[in-house]
């Protein structure tokens, strides 16, 4: 296996981890309406747990309001119950046509809790990035035949620099999300 294959495989896995960070951070409530807050909440739809985003349109008509327009009006009560049971602290209101969710202001205490959650998720993903680096280093050790010590060291340095750049990306996303949470 060539060094380029090891590094490109590592980058692919790390890109997926960055996408997971963005998705995880999207589910953290910030006081602003964002469809990702509710789109993955599962609703019992004819015996199948289905995400809300497959049951209707989610729009943001105002900065602190989400509107869900279900395709099937008969499921509105179930969507409402699923949102209330989600643990996000959201109170949906159903007018028979759409479900409106007003996003309440965050308290200072809740902002601190959310910042801790963001840091925790960030640290989990940094560990995942480091594990990907470890796997790449192990792959390199298995395929060192025909490589000089200098070539091996150069490849190890590239793996480390790539890892550092992805950890920096996670740190930047974390700082951005924390700022979003703590900004009133």
Swiss-Prot record:
Q: Where does this protein reside within or beyond the cell? A: Cytoplasm
NCBIfam families attached to this UniProt entry: frr
Q: Which GO terms describe its biological process?
A: translational termination
Principal location: cytoplasm
Keyword Signal listed: no
Q: What does this protein do?
A: Responsible for the release of ribosomes from messenger RNA at the termination of protein biosynthesis. May increase the efficiency of translation by recycling ribosomes from one round of translation to another.
State the protein's name: Ribosome-recycling factor
| Taxonomic superkingdom | Bacteria
Per the record, its GO cellular-component terms are: cytoplasm
Q: Indicate whether Protein biosynthesis appears among the record's keywords.
A: yes
InterPro entries, sorted: Ribosome_recyc_fac, Ribosome_recyc_fac_dom, RRF_sf
In Gene Ontology terms, what is one molecular function of this protein?
ribosomal large subunit binding
Q: Recall the taxonomic lineage recorded for the source organism.
A: Bacteria, Pseudomonadati, Spirochaetota, Spirochaetia, Leptospirales
- Keywords on record: Cytoplasm, Protein biosynthesis
Q: Which family does it belong to?
A: Belongs to the RRF family.
């Amino acid at each position: 296996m060539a060094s380029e294959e090891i590094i490109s495989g590592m980058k692919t896995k790390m890109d997926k981890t960055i996408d997971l960070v963005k998705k995880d951070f999207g589910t953290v409530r910030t006081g602003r309406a964002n469809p990702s807050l509710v789109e993955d909440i599962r609703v019992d739809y004819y015996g199948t747990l289905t995400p809300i985003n497959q049951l209707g349109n989610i729009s943001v008509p105002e900065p602190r309001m989400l509107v869900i327009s279900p395709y099937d009006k008969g499921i509105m009560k179930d969507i409402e119950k699923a949102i209330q049971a989600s643990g996000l602290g959201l109170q949906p209101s159903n007018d028979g046509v759409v479900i409106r969710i007003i996003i309440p202001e965050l308290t200072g205490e809740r902002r601190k809790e959310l910042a801790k959650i963001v840091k925790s998720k960030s640290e989990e993903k940094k560990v995942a990035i480091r594990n990907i680096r470890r796997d790449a280093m192990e792959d390199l050790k298995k395929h060192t035949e025909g490589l000089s010590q200098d070539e091996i060291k150069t490849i190890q340095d590239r793996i480390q620099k790539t890892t550092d750049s992805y950890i920096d990306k996670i740190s930047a996303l974390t700082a951005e999300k924390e700022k979003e949470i703590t900004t009133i």
